[in-house]
Design a protein with these regions (language model features):
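Active-site nucleotide/adenylate-binding loops and adjacent lid/helix of ATP-dependent enzymes
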Residues: 1-9, 36, 49, 92-195
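Residue-level detector of structured alpha->beta connecting loops
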Residues: 53, 79, 184-185, 272
Length: 330
């Protein structure tokens, strides 16, 4: 007899896409002979969970609803095991400003040579702008980030490229920071990184975790911003990444791909992620520049996670079955 699995969907961010993913998950779980139930996340969520008493939950929530750790807090309080990382780890992964520190701590602990690097960046808070006149330091930022303009401005905690801007001068920098600080308490100003944009799903926990084939993201126009992410057909996904995108030499491309996968696993382990996740990065021609980590991946059949699993020879029913069993045993 299969597990009784609550599939959480809806929420406040892209609820329609959340429901699409949930329906794909439900179909896969039924094929794996489990008993999935669609649970809409609203004011009656806890009552529904306490009444139905599922064995495991899988979150198909999008954005902060699924990634910030809040829904995991609720599930932990309700004593419902959930596929994926703990609430604390979700919060850590959601905080882009803490990524470099987490990688440094991992390096200090393991004493391994670290492959993963983050973009050079500065962090400014809403409080600094409102109470301490931080606007005045903007003229100094170009000299603090060695690459100079263009720069990338993003909220420290947001998803789906919300609030991410490319800025070319101090005037745009000020505007972008104020917009980013409407979405989060802190904002990052980073070097703008050009290269091959990739997302790499990971399965497993600790030293048993492994990377699925990297997925190459190619916008049809411009860069992979919030509009491109939200528009059907605006982006091409190549699974796995094309060798030619990494190097004209196939052996070199394979070596680069192995380096990318090592970097991804460093991030995954540094953050303490379990079961599954995705790491976004740019290969700049010399190294893997980590952009962010997602502890609650999109399980829709057409999304990068499922496509990477398929490229690795894994079916969505088998994958979700393994993840549900792992969550139950955690």
């Amino acid at each position: 007899m299969g597990l009784k699995i609550a599939v959480l969907a809806g929420g406040t961010f892209e609820p329609e896409r959340s429901i699409v993913a949930a329906n794909d998950v439900i179909a896969a779980l039924k094929e794996a002979e489990h008993e999935p139930e669609l649970v809409m996340v609203d004011g009656g969520l806890v009552d529904t969970l306490l009444r139905s008493q599922p064995d495991v939950a899988i979150s198909c929530l999008r954005g902060a609803d699924g990634e910030s750790g809040d829904i995991q807090d609720v599930l932990e309080a309700a004593n419902v095991p959930c596929v994926g990382s703990s609430a604390a780890v979700c919060r850590r992964a959601y905080d882009k400003a803490g990524l470099a520190e987490a990688l440094q701590a991992y390096h200090n602990l393991t004493e391994d040579v670290t492959t993963a690097v983050t973009a050079q960046s500065l962090t400014l808070s809403r409080r600094a702008f409102g109470a301490w006149g931080a606007e005045a330091v903007l003229s100094q930022i170009e000299s603090r980030i060695s690459s100079g303009y263009p720069l990338c401005v993003k909220p420290a905690s947001a998803s789906a490229a919300q609030g991410v801007r490319r800025v070319e001068n101090a005037e745009q920098l000020s505007e972008a920071l104020h917009e980013a600080l409407k979405l989060a308490d802190r904002a990052l100003v980073q070097q703008w990184v050009e290269g091959v944009e990739l997302t790499v799903p990971v399965i497993g926990t600790g030293w048993n975790a492994f990377a699925l084939p990297p997925v190459e993201i190619v916008p049809n126009a411009g860069w992979y911003d919030a509009a491109a992410r939200a528009t059907v057909g605006a982006v091409e996904l190549h699974t796995p990444v094309r060798n030619a995108s990494l190097s004209p030499s196939e052996p070199d491309a394979q070596a680069i791909r192995a380096e990318i996968e090592r970097a991804v696993l460093e991030v995954y382990r540094a953050l303490g992620m379990r079961d599954c996740g995705c790491i976004d990065l740019i290969w700049d021609g010399a190294q893997a520049i980590i952009l962010e980590a997602t502890a609650n991946p999109n399980f829709a059949a057409e999304a990068s996670f499922a496509q990477a699993a398929k490229a690795a020879g894994l079916t969505l029913p088998n994958l979700l079955n393994e993840l549900a069993e792992s969550a139950l045993d955690a």
